[in-house]
From Swiss-Prot:
It comes from the Bacteria. It is a multi-pass membrane protein. This is UPF0397 protein LEUM_1974. The lineage of its organism: Bacteria, Bacillati, Bacillota, Bacilli, Lactobacillales. HAMAP family: UPF0397. It comes from Leuconostoc mesenteroides subsp. mesenteroides (strain ATCC 8293 / DSM 20343 / BCRC 11652 / CCM 1803 / JCM 6124 / NCDO 523 / NBRC 100496 / NCIMB 8023 / NCTC 12954 / NRRL B-1118 / 37Y). The keyword Amino-acid biosynthesis does not apply. Signal peptide: none annotated. It is found in: Cell membrane.
Amino acid sequence: MKENNKKTGLSVRSVVATGIGAAVFFILMKYIAIPTGVPNTNVNVAEGWLALIAGLFGPVVGFLVGVIGHTITDATYGAPWWSWVLADGVFGLLLGLSKRFLDLEGGDLSTKKLVQFNVWQIIANVIAWLIVAPIGDILIYKQPASKVFLQGAAATIVNILSVAIIGSILLVAYVKSRPKKSSLRSE
């Protein structure tokens, strides 16, 4: 009988990262939310954290951290708003696709990679907050289009800024804390 050595599911490291990532995401989203003036839309520093977690662990962990963290946060206010929970999951998934070109574990984050990441996060924000969230609000909750697209536009702008500032700082700080692949030599 031939044994199948193919890995399935998430690694222990990814499961732990998901749990810790979602817990920190919840704390940041719940307790460090800055109102924008648009109803139910805040400057969300948790999105900067999601950029680091997704960039380190990839799209599956990014998706799970966004969905779990947002669901728990919404549950503390009464009930999850599923269209925005899904949008956060999509955002985490899209940010996680940056793992390949960022290579944060390698200890080298060039200006070019950081610019590429920020261009990608702008695209990911537009998809999540100007497409997924408003269309979900219309389809699931029968919300007026003018309201939800205003909320989506505000969320897009503030989340782009949150990830560009907080996310970039976290990415750079993480890489500076890691040895470069070429810095260790055997003797």
